[in-house]
Structure formats: C-alpha cells, structure tokens
Amino acid sequence: MIQRQFTVYGCVQGVGFRFFTAREANKLGIQGYVKNQADGSVRVVAAGSDRQVAAFRDWLEQGPPTAEVTNLLEQEYTGGRVFSDFTIER
C-alpha cells in the first residue's frame, strides 16, 4: 500500500469537488481524505495499491464535470495517519 498527497488547484471549491472525490475514492477502494484549503485549493490524501492510486490520480487531473482543475501537485504523504476509509474533512 502506498500513500500520496495531492494538492488540486483551479475552480475546485464550491462545486462539489469533495463530494465527487469521495465518491470516486470509494469506487476505487481508496482510503484517506479530502479537505478544502484556505488558499482555494483542495488537499487529497490517498492510500491504496499502486494501481488504485494511479487511477485516482488520473481522475483527480480531470476532476468532476463541475470543476476546472488547472494544476495537480503530488508528493509522498508523510503525515503518519492510518486510514480505514475515505472521509470528507472540514
């Protein structure tokens, strides 16, 4: 299992991005969370197999139809949390 952190930029707040992201994560079997950031971006932490996280990354690059993703940054997640499901954090 790998853990990755993504920061999604663009028109990604106020458009249902967190809801759709959680739905896609559950569909793919991803664990972790999604959370709005003060700068207008969205942070996503994803835990799963290489294949699951790669498919999730591909989805995040596009986002849901209601959003406009302009940039996606990816880095190793070093937060130390262990996830058992995927949640929307406030």
From Swiss-Prot:
Cited PROSITE patterns: ACYLPHOSPHATASE_1 (PS00150), ACYLPHOSPHATASE_2 (PS00151), ACYLPHOSPHATASE_3 (PS51160)
EC nos: 3.6.1.7
Transcription found in the keyword field: no
Catalytic reactions on record: an acyl phosphate + H2O = a carboxylate + phosphate + H(+)
Keyword Magnesium (UniProt): no
One MF annotation (Gene Ontology) recorded for this entry: acylphosphatase activity
Residues at the active site: 18, 36
Pfam families: Acylphosphatase
Acylphosphatase-like domain span: 3-90
UniProt xrefs under Gene3D superfamilies: 3.30.70.100
Keywords of this entry: Hydrolase
Signal peptide as annotated in the record: none
Family per similarity comment: Belongs to the acylphosphatase family.
Protein name: Acylphosphatase
UniProt lineage: Bacteria, Pseudomonadati, Pseudomonadota, Gammaproteobacteria, Pasteurellales
Gene name per UniProt: acyP
